[in-house]
Amino acid sequence: MMTLRDLINKLLGRETASANTARERLQLVLAHDRVDMSSLTTDLLDKMRKEILDVVAKYVEIDFEEVAVSLETEDRMTALVANLPIKRTISGEIKFKKNDKTDQADKDIKK
């Protein structure tokens, strides 16, 4: 039976904590249904983690003890999140290649 307080809360759009919890759980279930999470086994995630670290380690020195790779779900989207603390770059600094348009713009500015 709905109490007067429940009716007022419903009319004003207020929700109970359990309703919020239920909604969050449902969103998580829906997100997992949309992405075939069963194909992302622990072995596959470990392999992805190693390959990502191998590529990044070619360019920068990583603090491997602090590396964190996880799957996070928010707003019906699952993301692979990698936190890779960088100690320093391998060559001392990272140099970015400029494309022709950027080079021309730099020359125009210097004139």
Curated annotation (Swiss-Prot):
This protein's UniProt keywords: Cell cycle, Cell division
Superkingdom, natural source: Bacteria
Family annotation (InterPro entries): MinE, MinE_sf
Pfam families documented for this protein: MinE (PF03776)
Keyword Cell cycle: yes
Function according to Swiss-Prot or TrEMBL: Prevents the cell division inhibition by proteins MinC and MinD at internal division sites while permitting inhibition at polar sites. This ensures cell division at the proper site by restricting the formation of a division septum at the midpoint of the long axis of the cell.
Species, as recorded: Prochlorococcus marinus (strain MIT 9312)
Name of the protein in its database record: Cell division topological specificity factor
Any GO BP annotation: cell division
Positions in coiled-coil regions: none
Keyword field contains Cell cycle: yes
Family: Belongs to the MinE family.
